[in-house]
Amino acid sequence: TKEWYTDPFADSLNLENIKSEDIKNYIINHEEVHPTLTKEQEKAIAYAHKYCGAAADEEDGLMFNKKYKDFNGDGGDCANFASQIMYESGRFKKNALWNYEKGSATKAWVNAQGFKNYIINSGRGSYIAKGGYEEVYREAYNLKPGDFVGYEKKGRITHVSTVTGFDSKGYPLVTCHNTDRLLVPWDLGWSDKAIRFHLIRV
């Protein structure tokens, strides 16, 4: 059940950049977006930014929510954090399959693969797109705050992150644990053609 996680920024340093000129032009020429947010989306953004461990606000910087166990020592905390965002924002209630209580969590709550499978199989989420970067980058512009991205390597989801904003060209930005990130590009710098992205609406 452990989800040993390699920082994708480091993983991409020695890999060829797959962003072609066509892709670069598409990204550069895309318009800024100003989505109308629901109360749940506003709460998801606020929670993610406060407890990501890399917050810009000095008061909240480098802090996780102490109400929850930090699962980094057990293989990774990314799915735990994504689950927290969904629960604390009021998006979903806990149940027998997706649950955290007194330092213990179900696989669907704390494991990246289990989390993705549960959200899809339960009907709580649906696919926007999945595939390599060149296959999904256009569809990524359909991501909204509170949606999440799963990162598949060698057939398994090894990481998840939550959409919490956009850059000046409308490129979705994510926030996550492992390694702690605040408002970074949704592709996380992964340029390995073996990586598949799962873009999921919740």
Predicted regions and their residues:
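N-terminal capping segments
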Residues: D22-W109
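Active-site-proximal beta-strand/loop segments in catalytic clefts of secreted hydrolases
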Residues: W98, Y151-K154, C176-T179
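Low-complexity, Gly/Ser/Thr/Pro-rich intrinsically disordered linker/tail segments
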Residues: Y171-R181, W186-V202
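Short, solvent-exposed loop/turn and secondary-structure capping segments
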Residues: K94-W98, V160-T162, W186
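Active-site scaffold segments
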Residues: G76-Q84, V160-T164, V174-T175
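...with weaker cross-activation on analogous glycine-rich loops/strands in unrelated enzymes
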Residues: G103-L173
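Acidic/His-rich structured neighborhood in mature extracellular/periplasmic domains
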Residues: D7-I18, A96-N117
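Short beta-strand edge/turn micro-motifs at domain boundaries
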Residues: T1-Y26, P172
